[in-house]
Every structure is written in structure tokens, then in C-alpha cells.
Amino acid sequence: MVKVSFKSVFFLFWPFLFFSGTLFALPQKAPDFDLQSPQGKLSLNQLRGQVVLIFFGFTACPDVCPISLSTISRVFHQMEEEEQQKSKALFITLDPERDKVEMMQEYTGFFHSNIIGLTDTAETISEVAQSYGVNYQKKKLERSALGYVINHSADIYLVDSSGMLVKRYPHDVEPEVLVAKIRNLLGH
């Protein structure tokens, strides 16, 4: 019989306690995707030459999603117009059942015009989320008009203008941190 102490198990797994999604080495080539935007299909490769922030969530999210999108909005408001023209943010839904293209456009419009809402089939969204290490799960809500919510990891991904995934930030990152990194990537 092998005895395993709590300490040995804890020290083996402790690094994973502080990350909300799957771990992967950075920088690395950002996984490309082809999702529905208000203007038709949009791939990450189409945004080459721009710095891109990516956040996964859903429009009925009561807390972390609007807070994260507000943070991203504040990032754009702190940037010069020229910097804004060289950057975008993508809000990828984890709830394609409810979040249709029109809903995504209306929702992201509340935050900033540089934020593009993306949706697609549940299968496609699952593949994209998995490629970014996003964990999510549908949870039924008894006695709620919503019927369900999506529990999900909540990182903000930063992709440079050459398509490299360079950094992953927690959802509560200060906007100034993102602005400084984007400016650095833009050479300002």
C-alpha cells in the first residue's frame, strides 16, 4: 500500500489552483477561428496588423462579463484614436443558444464600438473555447426566468498584431495594465 501525504499532493497540484483555465505556454500562435459577426464571418487572421483582446462570456451573465467588458471599454477610452484604430476586442459567446448575432451586436454596443460580438454553432464555439483553454459549463437554475447560466473561466487574452497570443490576464486586471501592454505592442 502506498501512502500519499496531503503535502505531497498539495505541492504537486498547487500551481493549478491559481488558474481558471487550461495552462499553455505563452507566447504561442493564437488559435484561429471563423465565427459569425454582425458583418458576416470573421476570423482572427482577418485582424492581423491589429492588437486584439479576446474575452469569452455570455450576454445574460450577471457579473463577470459586464465587469470585464467595462474594463475593456475603459482600455479603449484611455487610448488615443490612432491606437484605437490599431486594436479591437472580441467578445465570444459561450451561450450560442441565446446569443444570436443581433443580440451580440446590441450588447457589445453598450460598451464600446471596438468590441465585436461573435457567435456560431454550439459545436464551433466549444472548439474555439477549448483551443483557448476556456472552461465552461451550462448550469440549470431552478425557479429562475433565465432557466440556466454558464459557469465559465474569465480570462482576457491578448493577441499581438502578428497573431501571437502573448498574455492571458485575469478578468479583474486594471485597464491601465492592458493599455500599457497594448501601447508596448504597438510600439508607442
Where are these regions (language model features)?
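N-terminal secretory signal peptides that target proteins for export/translocation
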Residues: 1-7
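Bacterial N-terminal signal peptides
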Residues: 9-22
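N-terminal "domain-start" segment that seeds a small globular fold
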Residues: 21-48, 70
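Extracytoplasmic
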Residues: 28-30, 47-51, 84-89, 99, ...
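Short, internal strand/loop/helix patches
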Residues: 30, 106-153
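Short active-site neighborhood of thiol/selenol oxidoreductases, capturing the structured segment around
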Residues: 45-68, 72
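Structural microenvironment flanking redox-active thiols in thiol-disulfide oxidoreductases
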Residues: 69-128
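Thiol-/selenol-based redox modules, centered on thioredoxin-like
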Residues: 142-188
